From Swiss-Prot:
GO terms for molecular function: mRNA 5'-UTR binding. It comes from Actinobacillus succinogenes (strain ATCC 55618 / DSM 22257 / CCUG 43843 / 130Z). GO terms for cellular component: cytosol. It comes from the Bacteria. This is Translational regulator CsrA. The gene is csrA. Homodimer; the beta-strands of each monomer intercalate to form a hydrophobic core, while the alpha-helices form wings that extend away from the core. GO terms for biological process: mRNA catabolic process; negative regulation of translational initiation; positive regulation of translational initiation; regulation of carbohydrate metabolic process.
Length: 61
């Protein structure tokens, strides 16, 4: 795992077409902005896990 330190307004680039920018830091929460091509799905981990579980449930029917 790559661990980076960023300040508000600073950006991390992934490949040529994905950028993650730190927008705000308040207490223990960090607000980030993600720019990615429309064909790249972006989900919070807990939402992605729900999507995976729903897909597995549909495949077992």
């Amino acid at each position: 795992m790559l661990i980076l330190t960023r300040k508000v307004g600073e950006t991390v680039l992934i490949g040529d077409d994905i950028s993650i920018t730190v927008l705000n830091i308040r207490g223990n929460q960090v607000k980030i902005g993600i720019e990615a091509p429309k064909d790249v799905t972006v989900h919070r981990e807990e939402i992605y896990e729900r999507i995976k579980l729903a897909a597995e449930d549909n495949n077992h029917v």
